[in-house]
């Protein structure tokens, strides 16, 4: 039975989301034939012209703006010239796996003869470059260690690597702490004083930039017979997958990278492993979207790192054998099915615990929630924290034993707008030294570890910090809508255009509309979801809609105010549309 650790701190707030429409923005000049709806949506996201909405690779920020990039190139040039053994160390999430694959593939393309890779096992090594992982890596006899998507917080691991005489290049995108690891070179756009404009590069984006800088140096040195060198854009399928899956903001720089990667995937030019993964997931490669990456490809790759070993996912991304790729993709499909079952059971536990908390607090929601269960899996706590954060609209941390019966816990934190979760953990750490063993992350997500006997003290300290940092107004969930769709916009043409537009994601959200509908009929699917038939004046017949996870035992009102996404109904085919309901409120 899970225990809730934040039942003693509540603040009054409305549990009903507030749907608020975006301010109207007049779009700029668009080519003839552009749907007015699309132009309006782009403009409301700060991209009022085609150049801003659809950035090209030519608009990418220069690699030279990254602090340490020249020194990183120097390390790699020297390693390649002297046939040194280069070991790329990835991470056990999708960003870390794609970053590892990009690093290995890219360095080999640029002439490195001895490139190896490794990745920590979540259950065995924990996060990042740890001393125990360094001890195992010694068997590979590396000369140069290149971390991707981690390293900025791995002080002990870097010290252990340097003690063995290895050079260390850290490439990362996570926020640095007050003290940097003693690596030979660090490349991280979030270093203090770094001039790179896009602070939202994923780990895979950082290593891609290092490779671009390396190729430019080699071009200028006359290394390539054709004067150009290898085409690094062939790696953008991997860059796109890692960037979208890591939920970094899709600013113009990232949108240029993701758009180019999606074009390759849609054209069937992705690596063998990603093509097999798309097939295994049942997606149509020719119509692949960023949403497909986030909800189909990313979870399947992440499943390996959550329940098994991300070495399997990296093997998929590096293989050139279609048969092997299909076999690995099917294995990942099975692991992902297991992950879904584990996640559902843990989520059910968490929901029951939080229901008891709310009842104990006379219907008030806690200002923050910390959840722990001795039987939970550490690889899935992040998904549970995310689900509970969405349901409560509160910061949530979910903990599990690092391994069965262990006294060390691994936690995953998810936050809401208004609370920078990594800064909150940093403040707890500063006020209570030694309470948290390790932590790191971003504004909206973080990871941490601590001893089981420190949990109660941490709970009190964390809640105190949340009460101090979080404006009570932030506890009222704000749902930002793109407004109401006209009757003639509720059609397959507009739904299809929205699907293939974007790419949508963090910081450039997928369009969400709102409107008032009459519920003609409804039924429950799989004991969790609501399937509705709706009527809207001016629209002939009825409109299909589905609210995933929307069944909580109460029938919907006859008249409802919906926040929804417009989608094609792939099951009905033809010109059918379906509304994907995000919020259902009585009208």
Question: What residue ranges belong to the model's regions?
Answer:
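N-terminal amphipathic/basic leader segments beginning at the initiator methionine
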Residues: 1-28
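Hydrophobic helix-and-loop "lid/oligomerization" segment in the mid-to-C-terminal part
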Residues: 22-141, 164, 182, 216-453
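A residue-level signal for conserved active-site and pocket-lining positions in enzyme catalytic cores
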Residues: 42, 146, 302, 498, ...
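Mid-to-C-terminal polyanion-binding domains and interfaces
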Residues: 74, 78-82, 322-371, 405-407, ...
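Flexible glycine-/small-residue-rich
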Residues: 90, 148, 170, 189, ...
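Active-site cavity-forming subdomains of large catalytic enzyme subunits
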Residues: 135-204, 208-225
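A short acidic, amphipathic alpha-helical/loop segment
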Residues: 156-160, 369, 384-387, 493, ...
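Histidine-centered active-site/metal-ligand motif
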Residues: 173-174, 377, 442, 529
């Amino acid at each position: 039975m899970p225990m809730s650790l934040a039942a003693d701190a509540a603040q009054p707030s409305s549990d009903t989301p507030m749907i608020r429409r975006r301010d109207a923005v007049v779009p700029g000049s668009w080519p003839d034939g552009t749907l007015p709806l699309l132009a309006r949506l782009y403009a409301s996201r700060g991209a009022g012209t085609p150049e801003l909405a659809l950035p090209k690779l030519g608009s990418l920020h220069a690699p030279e703006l990254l602090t340490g990039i020249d020194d990183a190139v120097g390390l790699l040039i020297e390693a390649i010239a002297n046939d040194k053994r280069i070991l790329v160390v990835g991470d056990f999430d999708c960003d870390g796996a794609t970053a590892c694959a990009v690093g290995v593939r890219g360095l080999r393309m640029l002439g490195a003869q001895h490139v190896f890779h490794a990745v920590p096992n979540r259950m065995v090594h924990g996060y990042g470059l740890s001393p125990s992982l360094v001890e195992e890596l010694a068997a590979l006899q590396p000369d140069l260690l290149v971390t991707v998507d981690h390293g900025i917080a791995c002080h002990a691991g870097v010290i252990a690597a340097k003690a063995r005489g290895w050079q260390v290049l850290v490439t990362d995108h996570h926020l640095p702490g007050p003290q940097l690891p003693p690596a030979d070179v660090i490349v991280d756009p979030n270093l203090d004083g770094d001039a790179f404009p896009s602070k939202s590069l994923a780990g895979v984006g950082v290593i891609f930039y290092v490779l671009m800088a390396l190729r430019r140096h080699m071009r200028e040195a006359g290394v390539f017979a054709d004067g150009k060198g290898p085409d690094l854009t062939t790696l953008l399928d991997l860059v796109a997958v890692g960037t979208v899956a890591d939920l970094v903001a899709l600013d113009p720089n990232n949108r240029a990278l993701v758009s180019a990667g999606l074009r390759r995937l849609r054209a069937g030019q992705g690596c063998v492993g990603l093509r097999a993964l798309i097939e295994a997931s049942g997606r149509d490669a020719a119509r692949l979207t960023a949403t497909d990456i986030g909800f189909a490809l990313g979870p399947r790759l992440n499943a390996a790192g959550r329940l098994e070993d991300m070495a399997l996912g990296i093997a998929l991304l590096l293989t050139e054998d279609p048969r092997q790729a299909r076999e690995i993709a099917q294995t990942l499909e099975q692991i992902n099915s297991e992950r879904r079952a584990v996640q559902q059971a843990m989520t059910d536990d968490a929901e029951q615990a939080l229901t008891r908390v709310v009842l104990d607090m006379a219907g008030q929601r806690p200002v923050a929630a910390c959840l722990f269960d001795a039987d939970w899996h550490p690889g899935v706590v992040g998904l549970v924290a995310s689900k509970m954060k969405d349901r409560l609209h509160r910061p949530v941390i979910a903990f599990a034993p690092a391994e069965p019966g262990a006294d060390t816990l691994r936690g995953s934190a998810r936050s809401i707008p208004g609370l920078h979760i990594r800064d909150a953990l940093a403040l707890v750490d500063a006020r209570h030294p030694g309470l948290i063993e390790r932590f790191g992350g971003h504004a909206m997500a973080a990871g941490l570890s601590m001893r089981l006997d420190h949990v109660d003290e941490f709970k009190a300290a964390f809640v105190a910090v949340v009460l101090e940092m979080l404006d009570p107004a932030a506890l009222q969930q704000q749902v930002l809508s793109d407004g109401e769709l006209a009757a003639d916009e509720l059609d397959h043409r507009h739904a299809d255009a929205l699907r293939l537009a974007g790419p949508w994601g963090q910081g450039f959200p997928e369009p969400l509309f709102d409107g008032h509908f009459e519920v003609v009929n409804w039924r429950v699917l799989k004991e969790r979801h609501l399937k509705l038939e709706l009527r809207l004046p001016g629209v002939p017949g009825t409109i299909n809609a589905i609210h995933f996870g929307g069944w909580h035992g109460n029938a919907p009102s006859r008249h409802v105010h919906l926040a929804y996404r417009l989608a094609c109904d792939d099951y009905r085919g033809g010109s059918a549309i379906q509304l994907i309901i995000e919020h259902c409120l009585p009208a």
